A protein has these predicted regions:
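Active-site diphosphate/adenylate-binding microenvironment
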Residues: 22-27, 94
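Short alpha-helical interface patches
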Residues: 21-22, 37, 64
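Structured binding elements
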Residues: 109
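Short, contiguous pre-domain boundary segments
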Residues: 12-21
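Anion (oxyanion) recognition and catalysis
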Residues: 106
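Conserved AMP-binding/adenylate-forming core of the ANL superfamily
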Residues: 45, 49-103
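A short N-terminal helical cap/helix-turn-helix that marks the beginning
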Residues: 1-8, 27-49
Length: 110
């Protein structure tokens, strides 16, 4: 998938990398759809996010989990009237829900 977003993917040295790294970013690029949901198609069961609480509790999210949960978050935000180009301040102190909500907001273009 990286070939979709980089003009060159193989480099001969660090200097070559620094001089020739160039991103391809489509005008309608949406991280949630173009990257995360694509990974959900390619590797749905691979761990995409490992969240750890201050108490050591761990929650693992696969790419498919993130797709499904961010779809739900997007639908919820949309039901509140949030849409494309809306500004949203999201404050969730070190909670895994921040990632789900942020991807959902990306899907709306908010």
């Amino acid at each position: 998938m990286i070939e979709r977003f980089l003009k060159q993917t193989h480099f001969t040295s660090e200097q070559d990398f620094k001089e020739h790294l160039e991103f391809i970013i489509p005008e309608d690029f949406n991280f949630a759809y173009d990257v995360m949901d694509e990974w959900a198609k390619i590797k749905p069961d691979h761990v995409a996010l490992l969240w750890t609480s201050e108490r050591g509790e761990e929650i693992r999210f696969t790419y498919q989990d993130l797709k499904e949960q961010s779809d739900k978050a997007a639908a919820y935000f949309q039901s509140l009237g949030i849409g494309h180009d809306d500004k949203v301040m999201l404050i969730l102190k070190r909670h895994y829900q921040w990632w789900l909500a942020m991807l959902g907001l990306h899907k709306l273009g908010a």
